[in-house]
Regions:
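N-terminal binding-site loop/beta-alpha segment at the start of enzyme catalytic domains
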Residues: 1-89
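Conserved beta-strand positions
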Residues: 25, 55, 93, 128-131
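Active-site mouth loops of central-metabolism enzymes
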Residues: 26-37, 95-111
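Structural motif corresponding to the early beta-alpha repeats
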Residues: 58-59, 82-107, 132
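Glycine/proline-rich, positively charged
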Residues: 98-136
């Protein structure tokens, strides 16, 4: 992949964050048990200019009730072993899907979901927190 393509048309999400390119690394299927492989995937994305990392608390859920939060936990292990990577990414995650409800975008639920995401990813802040499929 051409690094210039990934970095073209970068934009700022806010003044406190570095600009992000038009492509993000989506972690929906980021479930490998191999931390080295997971770390390499993140480093490769960064090397290609993809600094926006998109996660969600529900990523990893098998809809049989297992796996909720596993993609965030994996990223947490990667960032624990390679903490220098945290400063190289703009970290986005989502909350609001609450199996079996399925959606809960109440402020109480989202506050707790965000706090749980911080713990799972072993970070002090999330750069962009989004409501995942809001119930309107």
């Amino acid at each position: 992949m051409d690094k210039n393509l990934v970095q073209s048309n970068s934009r700022f999400l806010c003044d406190d964050l570095p600009p992000v390119g038009p492509l993000a690394l989506g972690l929906w299927r980021y479930t490998t048990p191999d931390i080295g492989h997971a770390t390499n995937l993140l480093k490769t994305a960064i090397d290609l200019g993809m600094n926006l990392v998109d996660n969600a608390d529900v990523y990893g859920l098998d809809w049989g009730g297992k796996g909720f939060g596993t993609c965030e936990e994996l990223l947490g292990h990667v960032l624990s072993e390679s903490p220098e990577l945290r400063d190289q990414i703009v970290l986005a995650t989502k909350g609001g899907i609450q199996p079996p409800v399925p959606y809960n975008s109440s402020s109480d639920y989202l506050r707790g979901a965000c706090e749980d995401s911080l713990l799972r990813m072993n970070v002090e802040k999330i750069d962009l927190y989004q409501i995942h499929r809001p119930d309107m």
